[in-house]
Amino acid sequence: MKIQDYTKQMVDEKSFIDMAYTLLNDKGETMNLYDIIDEFRALGDYEYEEIENRVVQFYTDLNTDGRFLNVGENLWGLRDWYSVDDIEEKIAPTIQKFDILDADDEEDQNLKLLGEDEMDDDDDIPAQTDDQEELNDPEDEQVEEEINHSDIVIEEDEDELDEDEEVFEDEEDFND
C-alpha cells in the first residue's frame, strides 16, 4: 500500500518509522527529515503540537533502525539503496590532520600552537578581584588548639563488626 492511501486512522495506528520506510520506498530518493515529518502531518491532518512527542521517538528510531541511513545535511535514505563502499564513504568521519612538530618547530616564535589564542585573551584578568577574600584575612577566627588524634572517638556499628568477623571466619575456613 502506498503512503498516499493511508487514512488518518492508519496514520494514528502506524509508527512513524514504518511510515518513513514506506514513504522513502515509494519516493525512491532521499528526503529531508522535516519534509518527512511534514508528509506525516499532512497525512494525519495534525498540528505540530499534536505530533511533537511522536517526532522525538521517530528521530530516535531513525538513528537506531538499521534500515535507514543519514547521508548528510539531515537527508535520510534507505540503507538498501547503497553499496557497502558507498555507506562507508558517506558515514566515515573526517579526520583533521595535524603536522607533527619537531624540536625546531617548538622553538619557532611565529608558530601558534592549539589553545594559545585563548590564553592570550586572558592576560587582562587581574590575579585578585575586589570580591575575593585574602587567604590571611585577619577577620578569620584563630584556632586556639588543635585536636589531638587520641581525642577522636569513632563509633562503629555492631552489625558491621559482626559482618567483618564473619568474613574473617570465612577466610579462615577457606585457608584450611
UniProtKB/Swiss-Prot annotation:
Residues 14-81 form the HTH HARE-type domain. Keywords: DNA-directed RNA polymerase, Nucleotidyltransferase, Transcription, Transferase. One of its GO terms (molecular function) is DNA-directed RNA polymerase activity. Residues 114-176 are annotated as: Disordered. Residues 116-145, 153-176 have a biased composition (Acidic residues). InterPro entries: Asxl_HARE-HTH, RNAP_delta_N_dom_sf, RpoE. One of its GO terms (cellular component) is DNA-directed RNA polymerase complex. Transmembrane segments: none annotated. GO terms for biological process: DNA-templated transcription; regulation of DNA-templated transcription. It comes from the Bacteria. Participates in both the initiation and recycling phases of transcription. In the presence of the delta subunit, RNAP displays an increased specificity of transcription, a decreased affinity for nucleic acids, and an increased efficiency of RNA synthesis because of enhanced recycling. RNAP is composed of a core of 2 alpha, a beta and a beta' subunits. The core is associated with a delta subunit and one of several sigma factors. Belongs to the RpoE family. This is Probable DNA-directed RNA polymerase subunit delta. It comes from Staphylococcus aureus (strain NCTC 8325 / PS 47).
